[in-house]
Structure formats: C-alpha cells, structure tokens
Regions:
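Divalent metal-coordination and catalytic microenvironments
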Residues: 18, 28, 53, 105-108, ...
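Active-site-adjacent loop/tail segments of enzyme domains
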Residues: 131-157
Length: 250
C-alpha cells in the first residue's frame, strides 16, 4: 500500500513523497534537508526522483540527494542538472512497482513534464488547484493543449501540483466566474483547511473541471470574461491567453 505525503518547503512549495514502509520516490525536491529528515524518520530508502521542470525551487535539492546516493535514478527533462534518466514525454517510468506515464505538457516551460500513475498526477507548475502556471517559455496554444490533455484524465485523478496557490487562485477564479456556485463552495472548504494549517492539495480532476477557469475556456462565463479582457476570438487558446494575462496583473 502506497501513501502520499506533501512536504512543505519554502513559502508555498511541496515536495511530493510517495512511499510504502520501505521505499520512497520524491517529486520536485527543491530542498534536500526536509526530504532527508522525512526519510530518516521513517526508515525509508529513496528509490527514485521525478523532476517536472528545471526551475530551482523544483530542483535545488538534487545535487545533495544524489551525492549521498550514487546511481540514484533521477528522471526529468534533459536540461536539468542532475537528471541521469532524461525524458521528453511518451515514456514509462517504473518505480515502487507502479508504471508512470510521462506526459509532455509544454507551456510553463517548453520541456515541462507530468507523471501519471492512477490515481496520482504529478504536474509541477502546469496545472494548479484552480489555476495554471505562468507562460515563461511556452505559448497559450501549448498551455491550452497541455491542460486539455490533463483535463481528459479520470475525474478521480489526484492533482498533485507543487505550489500552495489555491486560495489566491480561487479569488481570481471567482472574478472570472462570479456565478459559479461550485467555486464559492470550494473556497469555503479550502479556507477552512488552511485555517487549520492543512494543505489544500491534492485536488481532484473533477473538482478542477468544475472550478478551474483554465479548464473551462469553452464555458460562456469564462468566454465573456476573456472578451472583456482582450480576447479577440472565442478559441480556447485565445480565451486562456486573455485570462492568463489578466491573472498576471490581478
């Protein structure tokens, strides 16, 4: 039986740790020390690392973790220093007895990857709870295609993104769709969780489809908001581009 633990680091990052009672894999280790403490406290051996993209808050712990474990498999984009199993999407990674489909999801970065083994989706900074990542390298069309690919996963998929941005994302989502009752209900639930010091993650794909404006670019309310903020047509990529630009200055 595998358990999933989010380890908080920095101001709002999580390292995701999937583990049984002997072995663990970790996703996007931005720091080594918190992960080392977690492993030591439970007597776990680190079996593999998965990396979604090259930004330092997702990779800063790689060097220390690998130095202590020569030969440790590190999967991720080729440009990430420390990756020794480079991936581009379309591969399968086997770890902890599970097969993870490697998905190319460009947008936030051009070589961003996600890892899916039901029910878990480790999606880095592509899909957030009620949001999506900034377009640092990719185009709106690429991000729209990537998010559409993820949104097609089963509704019970657990969305394990890397940042605790949920409350700020929900505030923006309500501005986009003020009439969405699911959004109001979700915000109440997530505010209560944060008030108790609990993470809002993982989310579910069904909840994202109901409340995430970037997965709802065909909804009339989202289209209307996008038109009001500069969308020149109603295509999914143009709607996403308009609301993402709005969010960048919200």
């Amino acid at each position: 039986m595998l358990a999933l633990t989010p380890l908080p680091i920095f101001d709002d990052n999580y390292i995701w740790v999937l583990h049984d009672d002997r072995h663990a894999l970790a996703v996007d280790p931005g720091l080594a020390a918190p992960l080392e403490r977690f492993l030591a406290g439970r007597g776990l051996q680190l079996a593999a690392l998965l990396v979604t993209h090259h930004h330092h808050d997702h990779t800063g712990g790689l060097a220390g973790l690998v130095a202590a474990r020569p030969g440790l498999p590190v999967y991720g984009p080729a440009r990430v220093a420390g990756v020794n199993r480079p991936l581009t999407g379309g591969e399968t990674v086997t770890a902890l007895g599970r097969d993870f489909d490697v998905l190319a999801v460009p947008g936030h970065t051009l070589d961003h990857l996600a890892y899916h083994a039901a029910p878990w989706l480790f999606c880095g900074d592509t899909l957030f709870a009620a949001g999506c990542g900034r377009l640092f390298e990719g185009t709106p069309a690429q991000m729209h295609a990537s998010l559409s690919r993820l949104a097609a996963l089963p509704g019970d998929t657990l969305v394990c993104c890397t940042h605790e941005y949920t409350l700020s994302n929900l505030k923006f989502a309500r501005a986009v769709e003020p009439g969405n009752a699911d959004l109001r209900e979700r915000e109440t639930v997530e505010q209560a969780r944060r008030a108790r010091g609990l993470p809002t993650l993982p989310s579910s794909m069904a909840l994202e489809r109901a409340t995430n404006p970037y997965l709802r670019c065909a909804e009339p309310g989202v289209i209307g908001a996008a038109r009001h903020h500069g969308a020149i047509d109603d295509t999914g990529e143009e709607v996403l581009a308009a609301i993402r630009r709005w969010k960048d200055t919200f």
